[in-house]
From Swiss-Prot:
Chain spans, region Disordered: 1-104, 235-274, 288-314, 494-598, 620-669, 835-888, 980-1004, 1017-1071, 1383-1436, 1454-1509, 1526-1651
The organism of origin for this protein: Homo sapiens (Human)
Biased composition (Basic and acidic residues): 507-521, 859-874, 1640-1651
Protein name (database record): Actin remodeling regulator NHS
InterPro entries assigned to the protein according to its UniProt record, in alphabetical order: NHS-like (IPR024845)
PTM annotation (Phosphoserine): residues: 415, 533, 739, 1176, 1329, 1499
Annotated Pfam families: NHS
Gene Ontology, cellular component aspect: apical plasma membrane; bicellular tight junction; cell junction; focal adhesion; Golgi apparatus; lamellipodium; nuclear body
Compositionally skewed regions (Pro residues) per UniProt: 65-76
Length: 1651
């Protein structure tokens, strides 16, 4: 356009100019224009044009063209070309006319002549020509430039093309090369590859760093030189070893020889040896690896694994793998097949070489073992842990070749002749570890696990147990290396030969892997020192000191390290043994994670990788013995003891256990040999474990393993006590380690760790330790089965429970293990610190003094909120809102964890987070996938394996870890683990909660009070709740076996996972949900209690969760809250209750499940299940629920509303359901201004129904129906109480059909009113109601149909009579008292009849807590035997009357003590509701575990507690019920102490509700019997289970909160109340949650009242 402008203007000028000259031009003549003038004028014009340019240039110059003048002329010529031809004059005139104007501007005002005009004409032409020429030139230039540009582009394109072709050629070459490559060559690793890949996350840092350094392709020159030197020295060493192998001592002497050479050239020798090993393998596999650097880097171990079988390394590899649980696991699975191969360690050197190369793969074998264990996998794992372990423990105890260590290997091991020598072998390997320690510290958790060749001494470790006096030092030294490596960051010191294997074990350590690098350095000196010291056995004391100084790298840990070391250093021998214990304990803790892994091995889950840390240690130490240990140990509850016990047992005995306990055996071996050394190192590790989370995890499982091993080998009480104490202490640390996994970043409060270290070492020698030993001992006779884990659990009361709690958050420690909790020991210290140094409930002693201690410890933990991880583990085993790493991991680990959450917390589990365990997820995702979340489910990490190592599961998914330790040698622990994997978050939380709740009724509540989300009691109950642990063991073994599924909660009564879920839920929904979490726990336990739950464990926990979700979807918030809230109440479930429930559960749950499947309505199934369960467990529940109810009422008026919405849900069983129902009615009535008469009416229904049921156990159809109707009536009344409470109750009276009609009506009315979870589920748990709120009509329909099934007429009569009785509250109260006494009497009288009637059995189970040992044993044994399920067989064995009685006493003491003490009162408040619901949940869940898996899992713990309570005192229970009844107002909540002290309180609605639970219990009792008899029984169990599930949901604070939130007004109000209640200790969780979660307006009223 500028050109256009200029062009136009020049033309203008021409035109304007010409008009003036026109006359002259015409006069002169058109032809007169002379060319000369043209040029000058042309120039002039150009000048003019340019001159005017100032005006034009403004327009024209803007054109970027460098020729402003030419463009104007160009148009001018065009115009002027024409003028000259014909229009010259015109143009000239115009131009002339215009030019004068333009000329003045240009300064040419004088040009007006004709000549000027002509000149202008010529000028225009010239200008046009010039302009045209210039334009053409410009165009040509532009074209030239364009051509050059195009040429450049073409050249660039050509270059690019050439490059592309070159690249294509290269790619083609690469493709050709790749096509030539065989993927399997790199994946060749003999099934270790995929496991390794799974675990490589854990050990990749250590291994890959090392591999990169050591692999031929990636080796730096200096490293290559070192490699060459190492190869040379290794060859020399091998020659030495071979020459020695010719002699008997080749196994033991060779390691010593290796130790001597490596020590001199510490880093070099170690590195060289490792490189030699690797180079040897690399040379062998170089061709395979060299093709791809990755292959060299990653595949070296894998190739080695697959390759070594060709040469002697095959044996070594196998030996290493057993040490590193790869082959050990197969050996375990194959009984001795792999052991024969692997255990005959070809040469310690070769073993070390292969370990160095196959550390990852070695660790992987743990998971492989899980696969190999498949022959017995799911059931075998559970069975082995619960039954097989329980049964085999005696065998395995003698079985030195527990996992199939061939006798020749044993002999070779023995050839060393002295356990010390063999252990020294291991220690020698350990000594080289320091060099590797740096590597491991730098990049590996693996390194901490792979500690040293101490594994070699595994068999001698068994010997050590036998040779307690002398062997302690030797065994300490022996196990010190392994444990040091496992537990201590210093373990890396053992890397050279031992480190490889140890590392392979180390790798499985979840927690360690993630956060072990730093502590390793600090601990490494300790490990090395200890290893060195252990080499000298007594030199170890100085080494310990040097250890403490040498672990400055772990500065945070050092204070503790110094303390622990100093304390242990006091006496070399004692210190060695203690340190060995401590180390063993810590190893047990570390192995705990490993053990979970071990279980994973058994289960073939990634957890085994973690387990390998401990397992590898064990297997490495003593292939055969280690596996025995591992087998028994990681069986946690059952297998650990047997493996330890069966050390002397022939290999034949070992295979079954091996399959189940293979990893545990490894862990045990690791633990025993390493534990001794680790006694000091372990203490040191406790400080270091802060980073050594994996080690801590391993310590967890390993603690139990170590405890068992040490217990078995160290039968003497003194050593055993010390050992057990340290072991448990470390186990607690380990558990804490899991929970702190997420706080691991916080460094877990080093000072606390230090204090804990001091405390731990102090406790190691403290009576508490010995008391733990008693617990240890209690099951020790049966094969360390219960003894070890009991110890773990008891000691873990503080430590295990805390540790479990730690797991919960991590999991998805979540499942994942909680790498954040690096040091189990450190956590233990924190735990001590937190729980109170004086009251150390590390292990509950046989004397049962620890429960109070446990409460104390939990309390302390709660008090020490500053140490969140420690607190977390205690509170919720990974359910802290802050770091539900386990829960979140879980997936656990898991939790974790997912996590293994972290690895599991979150995790979670977690879960799945152990999960996740995940690590929390570090724990392979079996649990968390989580959690497994790997080990910690990695929860989240989740949920590695439910069957194998419940302890591991708990570790993996903190929830179950807690249970595992709690139920130490019982199926309970196992069940918890199983449950954990499934619901890393929810179930893990439940398990945690249950474990905590039963363990620390007061402590847990207090903890909850301190940090509701943390579920303070979680850890404590699990570990410390000996009764809970023991009894669940009996009943859970079946569930555990049937459900080796990661959620082993079916077996475990205290579903720590559930609890974890609770914590998770609180984290998700409300800080106050911790109470809800507790409630949640009870629900899962019942499921696990159920054999059907056991059968459905794999499906059930998830199924349970699915129902939970279904309910949650229906009333998501409410149900979720209820579900999570319920488990803690369930925790009160006694092992006996669990067993009794389990017996029925198998049939009922399955039947109910069928019904549930038949009836698409989950609510209906739940209802029927609830009905059946409520009736069947009614006898147990009357006590459990009544106690729980009274406790709930007395504990918290605030919780009353919470319980009202959540109590029913909270009550896993029908009893609790009905009680909660009553609560709901009562509380709702109060909140809703419903008259006490109406509440009485409802209560009367339930009570009458219950009485009827109790009175007529056989006509249970009627009672069941009645029970269902009354409950429904209650709920419906609760739901519709404001409008039609009386009418509805009366309507119930007319008949089942009418009632059904009304109930169906109520659902619409009640659902709207109770749109929250509670109201709908009258029969079902109130937790069911959230689910049922949506499906109330169907549910009620189903329920009523069920009622009809039972007996329409009797139901009608009973309802009418109940309605009649409703008005007479006093009568009802007396009735209830009668019922309570009747239940008590019945429980006493029916103990022998436990199998006859569900109610009787339940009552008997409830009575288990009562003084009668037969009551305890009979219900469990009879139930399990009646079920004829293998699972129960093992529980019976592990559960001695004595043990059960002790557990019950412990539980009673806790319950009573809690009630008595102020702190306990607070906890009681929170716990009582939990207990009540737990009790109910347990009862109901047994029949309906399938449907109610989550609830069942939660309920067992509470039921256990409730059973204890009821057993403790029927009178007390009656008082509590009465008080609770009087305490009907949600607003008025008395503490448990208040209830106990002032039995009679305002009894209008509260009393009624309190009574009604008893009635419900009675009805449940009758119902149980009826279930078996009548077609309704299938439905009834389903109803119970479903109802239980619903109840669970309602009880779950989280789930319930969610559902409550769904309803606008009521839910909002309820939620607020819920939050307040949750914030309240545990009070609101139970009752408030039930109320709130209940969809009914009563919930709101209750909440308001409680508020």
């Amino acid at each position: 356009m500028p050109f256009a402008k200029r062009i136009v203007e020049p033309q203008w000028l021409c035109r304007q100019r010409r008009p003036a000259p026109g006359p002259a031009v015409d006069a002169s003549g058109g032809s007169a224009e002379p060319p000369p003038p043209l040029q000058p004028p042309g120039r002039r014009d150009l000048d003019e044009v340019e001159a005017p340019g100032p005006e034009e240039p403004a327009r024209a110059v803007p054109a970027p063209s460098g020729l402003p003048p030419p463009p104007p002329p160009l148009p001018a010529p065009a115009d002027q070309t024409q003028p000259p031809h014909g229009e010259a004059s015109v143009a000239g005139e115009e131009s002339t006319a215009g030019i004068p104007e333009a000329a003045p501007a240009a300064g040419e005002a004088s040009s007006a002549a004709a000549a000027a005009a002509v000149l202008l004409m010529l000028d225009l032409c010239a200008v046009s020509n010039a302009a045209l020429a210039r334009v053409l030139r410009q165009l040509s230039d532009v074209a030239r430039h364009a051509c050059s540009l195009f040429q450049e582009l073409e050249s660039d394109i050509q270059l690019t093309h050439r490059r592309v072709w070159a690249l294509q050629g290269k790619l083609g070459g690469v493709q050709r090369v790749l096509s030539t490559l065989d993927p399997k060559q790199e994946a060749v690793p003999v099934s270790n590859l995929d496991i390794e890949s799974k675990l490589s996350v854990y050990y990749r840092a250590p291994w890959h760093q090392q591999r990169n350094i050591f692999l031929p392709a990636t080796r730096p020159p200096c490293v290559e030189e070192l490699h060459r030197h190492a190869r040379q020295s290794l060859q020399a060493l091998r020659r030495e070893h071979r020459s020695r192998s010719d002699r008997r001592e080749q196994r033991a002497a060779a390691p010593l020889s290796i130790a001597a050479p490596p020590l001199p050239a510490y880093p070099p020798a170690h590195s060289q040896r490792r490189r030699e090993f690797k180079d040897r393998h690399f040379l062998t596999f170089n061709s395979t690896r060299s093709p791809s650097p990755t292959e060299c880097c990653h595949m070296t171990p894998w190739s080695r694994k697959s390759h070594p079988p060709e040469d002697e390394d095959t044996d070594v590899m196998l030996g290493q793998r057993p040490k590193n649980p790869i082959h050990n696991i197969p050996s375990t699975l194959d009984k001795q097949t792999n052991w024969s191969k692997a255990l005959p360690l070809p040469t310690p050197e070769e073993k070390m070489k292969q370990d160095a190369q196959v550390i990852s793969s070695c660790i992987i074998p743990i998971n492989v073992t899980g696969v190999g264990f498949d022959r017995e996998a799911s059931i075998r794992c559970s069975l082995v842990h619960s039954q097989s372990v329980l049964q085999r423990r005696r065998k395995l105890r003698r079985r030195k070749t527990i996992s199939g260590i061939p006798r020749r290997v044993q002999q070779e091991i023995d050839s060393d002749e002295s356990p010390v020598a063999r252990e020294r072998n291991v220690i020698v390997h350990t000594n080289p570890d320091p060099s590797n320690t740096v590597n491991r510290i730098s990049g590996t958790r693996d390194s901490e696990c792979q500690t040293e060749d101490i594994l070699i001494a595994a068999p001698s470790r068994r010997r050590i147990r036998a040779q307690r006096g002398q062997s302690i030092a030797a065994s300490l030294s022996h196990s010190a290396g392994n444990i040091s490596a496992l537990a201590d960051k210093g373990d890396t010191m053992f890397t050279p030969a031992v480190s490889s294997r140890t590392r392979s074990r180390s790798l499985p350590r979840e927690g360690n892997r993630g956060g072990d690098a730093e502590p390793k350095v600090g601990a490494k000196p300790s490990a090395y020192e200890e290893g060195e010291s252990f080499v000298g056995d007594h030199e170890r004391t100085p080494n310990d000191f040097s250890e403490a100084p040498s672990s400055p790298s772990a500065q945070d840990h050092q204070p503790t390290l110094g303390l622990a070391c100093s304390q242990h250093l006091h006496s070399p021998q004692h210190k060695l043994s203690e340190r060995g214990r401590s180390r063993l304990s810590r190893m047990a803790a570390d192995s705990g994670s490993c053990d979970i892994s071990s279980n994973s091995d058994t289960f073939g889950s990634p957890i085994h990788c973690i387990s390998t840390a401990g397992v590898l240690l064990s297997s490495h130490m003593d292939q055969k013995d280690d596996h025995q240990s591992s087998s028994g140990n990681w069986s946690g509850s059952s297998s650990t003891c047997p493996s330890q016990t069966s050390e002397t047992i022939p290999p034949a005995a070992s295979p079954p256990l091996t399959g189940s306990s293979h990893c545990d055996s490894e862990l045990s071996l690791n633990t025993a040999p390493h534990a001794n050394e680790d006694a000091s190192v372990f203490v040191t590790e406790q400080y270091n474990d802060h980073l050594d989370k994996v080690r801590g995890h391993r310590a967890n499982s390993f603690t139990s393993t170590v405890a068992d091993l040490l217990d078995d080998p160290n039968n003497s009480n003194t050593s055993d006590s010390e050992w057990n104490y340290l072991h448990h202490h470390h186990d607690a640390s380990c558990r804490q380690d899991f929970s702190p996994e997420r706080p691991k970043a916080d460094s877990l409060g080093c000072p606390s760790f230090t204090s804990m270290a001091t405390y731990d070492s102090f406790l190691e020698k403290s009576p508490s330790d010995k008391a733990d030993t008693s617990s240890h001992f209690s099951v020790d006779t049966e094969g360390y089965y219960t003894s070890m884990h009991f110890d773990c659990g008891l000691k873990g009361n503080k430590s295990y429970v805390c540790h479990y709690a730690a797991l919960g958050p991590e999991n998805g420690q979540g499942v994942g293990a909680s790498p954040g909790l690096p040091d189990c020991a450190w956590q233990d210290y924190l735990d001590h610190k937190r729980q109170g140094r004086p009251s150390i409930s590390f292990r509950k002693p046989k004397a049962k003094p620890t429960p109070p201690k446990r409460s104390s410890s939990l309390r302390k933990s709660d008090g020490n909120a500053d140490i969140s991880e420690k607190k977390e583990p205690k509170i919720s085993s990974g359910q802290h809102l802050p770091h539900s790493s386990r829960e979140m991991k879980l997936p656990l680990d898991f939790a974790n964890t997912p996590s293994r959450m972290e690895n599991a917390n979150l995790p979670t589990k977690q879960e799945p987070s152990w999960i996740n365990q995940s690590e929390q997820g570090i724990k392979e995702p079996q649990l968390d996938a989580s959690d497994i979340p790997p080990f910690k489910d990695e929860v989240a990490e989740s949920t590695h394996y439910a069957d194998l190592w419940l302890l591991n599961d708990l570790k993996t998914n903190d929830p179950y870890r807690s249970l595992s330790n709690s139920s130490t040698a019982t199926g309970t622990t196992v069940i918890e683990c199983i449950k954990s994997p499934e619901s890393s978050e929810s179930q893990t939380s439940q398990s945690e909660s249950r474990a905590t709740t039963p363990s620390l009724p007061s402590v847990d509540n207090e903890f909850k009070l301190a940090s509701p989300e943390k579920l303070a009691g979680l850890a404590s109950p699990s570990s410390g709740y000996s009764s809970q642990s023991e009894t669940p063991t009996s009943s859970f073994p079946t569930a555990f076996f049937s459900g080796p599924l990661s959620p082993g909660g079916s077996k475990r009564k205290p579903k720590v996972p559930e609890r974890k879920s609770s914590l998770q839920q609180p984290s998700l929904k409300d800080g106050t949900i911790s109470l809800s979490k507790d409630l949640e726990l009870p629900i899962i336990p019942p499921t696990h209690l159920d054999l059907s739950a056991l059968h459905n464990v794999l499906n059930k926990p998830f199924h349970h969760r699915h129902p939970l979700h279904v309910f949650t979807h229906n009333k998501q918030n409410t149900v979720g809250e209820t579900l999570r809230s319920n488990p803690p109440p369930s925790l009160a479930i006694t092992p006996t209750i669990l067993k009794s429930v389990n017996l029925r559960s198998i049939n009922k749950s399955e039947e109910v499940k069928q019904k549930e499947e038949n009836n698409t309505d989950l609510p209906y199934l739940e209802e029927s299940t609830l009905t059946t369960a409520a009736l069947s467990p009614s006898k147990i529940r009357p006590h459990t629920a009544n106690k729980s109810v009274s406790r709930q009422y007395s504990t918290e008026d605030t919780i009353l509303s919470f319980l009202d919405s959540s109590a029913v849900e909270m009550g896993p069983d029908k009893l609790h359901l009905e009680k909660n129902s009553t609560f709901d009615v009562k509380n709702r009535c109060d909140p809703e201004t419903i008259t006490s008469a109406g509440s009485s009416l409802l209560d009367s229904n339930v009570t009458k129904d219950q009485v009827r049921t109790e009175t007529e156990p056989i006509p249970e159809n009627t009672p069941t129906k009645n029970c269902a109707f009354p409950t429904e009536g209650f709920q419906r009344v609760s739901a519709a109480r404001p409008n039609d409470l009386d009418g509805k109750i009366i309507q119930y009276g007319p008949g089942p059909d009418e009632t059904l009609e009304q109930v169906q009506k109520a659902p619409s009315a009640g659902l709207e009113e109770v749109a929250q979870p509670e109201s709908v589920d009258v029969i079902t748990s109130q937790s069911d109601s959230p689910t049922r709120a949506t499906d109330v009509s169907n549910q009620f329909k189903h329920q009523f149909v069920m009622s009809r099934h039972h007996d329409k007429v009797p139901g009608t009569i009973s309802y009418e009579s109940e309605i009649t009785s409703v008005n007479s509250f006093p009568e009802k109260c007396s009735k209830q008292e009668n019922i309570a006494s009747g239940i008590s009497a019945k429980s006493a009288s029916d103990n022998s009849k436990a199998e006859e009637t569900q109610g009787n059995v339940d009552e008997a189970s409830l009575k288990e807590s009562s003084p009668s040992d037969d009551s305890i044993i009979s219900p469990l044994s009879e139930d399990s035997q009646a079920e004829a399920e293998g699972v129960f067989v093992s529980p019976n064995k592990p559960r001695t009357t004595e043990d059960l009685f002790a557990v019950i006493h412990r539980s009673k003491r806790k319950v009573l003590g809690r009630k008595d003490s102020g702190d306990m009162s607070v906890r009681s408040k929170s716990r009582a509701p939990l207990s009540s619901s737990s009790s109910s949940a347990s009862s109901i869940t047994s029949p309906s575990s399938n449907v109610t898996t989550p609830n069942s899992q939660r309920s067992p713990g509470l039921i256990y507690r409730n059973a204890k309570k009821s057993n403790t005192s029927n009178e007390e229970f009656k008082l509590l019920l009465l008080k609770k009844g009087s305490r009907s107002d949600s607003s008025y909540r008395m503490s448990a102490t208040e209830i106990l002290k002032s039995p009679i309180l305002p009894k209008p609605p509260g009393e009624l509700t309190a009574e009604s639970p008893q009635s419900t219990d009675d009805a449940h009792q009758g119902s149980q019997g009826a279930e078996a008899l009548s077609p309704l029984s299938p439905c009834s169990p389903r109803v119970n289970a479903e109802g239980f599930s619903s109840k669970s949901f309602a009880t779950s604070a989280s789930a319930r909160v969610g559902r409550s939130r769904a309803p606008p007004a009521a839910s909002s109000s309820r939620y607020s109340v819920r939050c307040r209640l949750y914030n309240t200790p545990m009070q609101a969780i139970s009752e408030g949650e039930t109320e709130n979660s209940d969809g009914s307006p009563h919930d709101d009223r209750s909440s308001q009242s409680s508020t």
